[in-house]
């Protein structure tokens, strides 16, 4: 019996998105206008300026917005800290470094706990404490990465001074142990973004600027305080597709946590369906 021939419907080619669709629902004018004036006042070539943005999706949006606003100008490098570090080539990660990969870090945490010899720390407690060690270390990673690598030893010593290893009774004893181990692990690890702390490694970058996000990013703030030539730009405002004006804030009341979660999910879905991305939660 001959094999039946399957057919597929050929979809027509879609047109390329317009500049407005690429730029998204952000009002880039204040931030990019300030950036353009600052670059000119500094006498810097625009292509030698790295501009940190909060989300990876904003890199292409910022580039499109700059091209629309300043079509005859060279374009700055719009990057996230992670993307910039990846392009620069970060340090080689060691086997026991904190990587924020749960599978890898769980193995390291189990090995760390296995090496600790404290009365009462048996196999059961090691299995119980390993996930907590990983979670605590992950919570510290963002903060530690915002500390200059050369200053992390002093940073660690200051924080260990307020912890008394093995103090207290019951679970407080294990909390102290986990806190000490997580601090030590996080502070002694290398991070991909560590390469950003050394301007000498970036000869093509003459200046650093940043557009703030919904919340302060510790690493971005620390880099702006460390690099010699920097500029903090105004935050972005959200605009509607209809009139380009910022969306007014809305406050919704919920009777309980379940209703609150459902309302929040509905609002996020509505924003995504309207093409407003990314959505900050």
Say what each PLM segment does:
Residues 36, 40, 197-200, 220-225:
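Short amphipathic alpha-helical segments and helix-helix/interface helices
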Residues 48-50, 75-77, 205-209, 230-231, ...:
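Beta-sheet entry/capping signal
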Residues 140, 203-257, 266-270:
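Conserved RecA-like helicase ATPase core segment
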Residues 61-65, 87, 222-226, 263, ...:
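Alpha-helical scaffold elements adjacent to nucleotide-binding pockets in ATP/GTP-utilizing enzyme cores
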Residues 65-72, 225-229, 273:
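Short, surface-exposed basic-aromatic patches at helix termini and helix-loop junctions that form
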Residues 2-51, 55-56, 241-281:
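Helicase P-loop NTPase motor core
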């Amino acid at each position: 019996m001959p094999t039946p021939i399957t057919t597929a419907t050929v979809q027509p080619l879609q047109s390329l998105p317009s500049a407005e669709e690429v730029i998204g629902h952000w009002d880039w004018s204040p931030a990019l206008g300030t950036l353009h004036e600052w670059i000119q006042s500094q006498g810097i070539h625009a292509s030698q300026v790295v501009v940190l943005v909060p989300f990876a999706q904003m890199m292409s949006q910022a580039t499109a917005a700059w091209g629309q606003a300043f079509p005859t100008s060279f374009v700055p490098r719009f990057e996230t800290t992670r993307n910039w570090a990846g392009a620069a080539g970060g340090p080689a990660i060691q086997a026991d470094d904190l990587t924020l990969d749960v599978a890898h870090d769980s193995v390291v945490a189990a090995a760390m706990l296995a090496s600790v010899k404290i009365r009462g720390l048996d196999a059961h407690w090691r299995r119980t404490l390993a996930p907590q060690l990983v979670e605590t270390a992950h919570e510290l990673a963002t903060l530690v990465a915002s500390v200059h690598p050369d200053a992390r030893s002093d940073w660690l010593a200051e924080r260990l001074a307020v912890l008394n290893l093995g103090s207290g009774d019951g679970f407080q004893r294990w909390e102290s142990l986990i806190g000490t181990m997580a601090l030590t692990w996080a502070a002694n690890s290398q991070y991909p973004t560590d390469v950003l702390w050394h301007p000498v490694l970036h000869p093509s970058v003459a200046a650093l600027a940043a557009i703030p996000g919904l919340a302060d990013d510790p690493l971005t703030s620390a880099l702006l305080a460390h690099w010699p030539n920097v500029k903090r730009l105004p935050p972005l405002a959200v605009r509607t597709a209809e009139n380009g004006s910022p969306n007014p804030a809305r406050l919704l009341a919920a009777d309980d946590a379940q209703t609150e979660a459902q309302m929040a999910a509905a609002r996020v879905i509505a924003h995504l369906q309207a093409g407003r991305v990314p959505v900050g939660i």
